[in-house]
Amino acid sequence: ACDNCSVAQYKVEYSISTQENVLDVWKVGCISEGVPVCDGTYPFSIEVSLIWVATDSTRRLNVEELNSSDYIEGDFTDQEVFGEFMSLKQVEMKTIEAKYDGPYRPATTRPKSLVSSEDVKGASKKKNSS
């Protein structure tokens, strides 16, 4: 299912500091309630660019560590999986790129904690070889 679905992309500037923020990030991923479900899962992945922050106050990060970032990508089938994933990462999230496989529906509301959101023009077509 979900062959040749259109992909809508968003780039989101976001800062995450609390568990409540994690839920906001998930809302960004869903953009709108009623995102089409394909084969029992939400048909989108969230690509996250992260800058790690120190969790141990006795240790300072050096400049190289502060400037380095890790890039991760994951497919999250539900909010619980996503929340568990984020809880394992003591991070400050700098950018989120969410891709949606399926009919695009614009968001009716956006989380207040969103710094900025930008629609990436020229949504591409994606084929899943499943």
UniProtKB/Swiss-Prot annotation:
Residues 100-130 are annotated as: Disordered. This is 29 kDa protein. It comes from Tobacco rattle virus (strain TCM).
